[in-house]
Amino acid sequence: MTKGTSKLLFMGTGCSSGIPNVCCLTLEKPTCRTCLASLTPEGRKNNRFNTSVLLQVDDGSGDRPKNILIDCGKHFYVSALKHFVEHKIRYLDAVILTHDHADAINGMDDLREWTLGFLQPSVKIYLTERTYKVIERSFPYMVNAKNATGGGSVPTFDFHVFSPDKPFKLDDIDISVTPLPVHHGVYFIEGKESQTYFCMGFRVGDMSYISDCNYVPPTTKKLMEGSNVVVVDALKHEPYPSHFSFKQAEEFIASLEHVPSRVLYTGFSHKVEHNETVKELSVLKVPTEPAYDGQIVEFHV
């Protein structure tokens, strides 16, 4: 069957701490404009959970859209309570992880509701070898239930390790996912110089998604060419060691040979106010906007 229109649902568009920032709001006299705006009806789009998206993919099977979650961080469960309930999303066909930071993996334990509640026997997790090893070390019971303590009720996962340098298929879903390796700061090994820390973006059909990066290698940029929808990291206006600034994101998009029809920034800090950013980005040559939690964008596979 012909594949149809698929949807990307923004589960979260904020940095690791999310927005609003509790330390801003507990000041005797709060002054953070973004955090204060998030408490008002007109500023509600400033409420941001950890960066994550849900892809609802029409793979041409004639069945329901396949639900593919990208990242399952600290705010996953509260985000799911909001967006899964609103859109009647139950089954998770796949979870793909970009990297091993807390805002990408620390909500995985909450996936137990899907497997302990007999909604599905297991959840398929797609990740790099590095991310798998971090999960194995940090949450050993997720990898082997024999490591469980207490009552022993733990989520059931089916891990699939993919290579960062070649496309991979998802079980029972007729689509290909292309990893987009990008730099996301550095890490340190004692006695050695700092090493580049790689995070994965992903291309699915005509949509490329990069949630965390400070540099896109030429080989990755080439894989993104031809994307009509591009979601890209843009933490704030000022430079930052592990994330694109607004200027860097703009310059990267401008460097693409094929101009995307739609660009969305994501991963904001509380230095970024949504309504002001809409106006700021509206003057760019390439149609660009700040994504917000709950926003839905169409793409094609």
Curated annotation (Swiss-Prot):
Q: Which CDD domains match?
A: metallo-hydrolase-like_MBL-fold
The family database entries (Gene3D superfamilies) matched by this protein are listed as: Ribonuclease Z/Hydroxyacylglutathione hydrolase-like (3.60.15.10)
Just give the chief location class: cytoplasm
Name one molecular function that GO assigns to this entry.
Answer: hydrolase activity
Name it.
Answer: Putative hydrolase C777.06c
Task: Tell me where it resides.
Answer: Cytoplasm; Nucleus
Q: Which superkingdom heads the taxonomic lineage of this protein's source?
A: Eukaryota
**TM spans, by residue?**
none
The record's section on InterPro entries has: Metallo-B-lactamas, RibonucZ/Hydroxyglut_hydro
Q: Which Pfam families match?
A: Lactamase_B_2
Sorted keywords for this record are: Cytoplasm, Hydrolase, Nucleus
Cite the SMART domains for this sequence. Lactamase_B
Any one Gene Ontology cellular component term annotated for this protein? cytosol
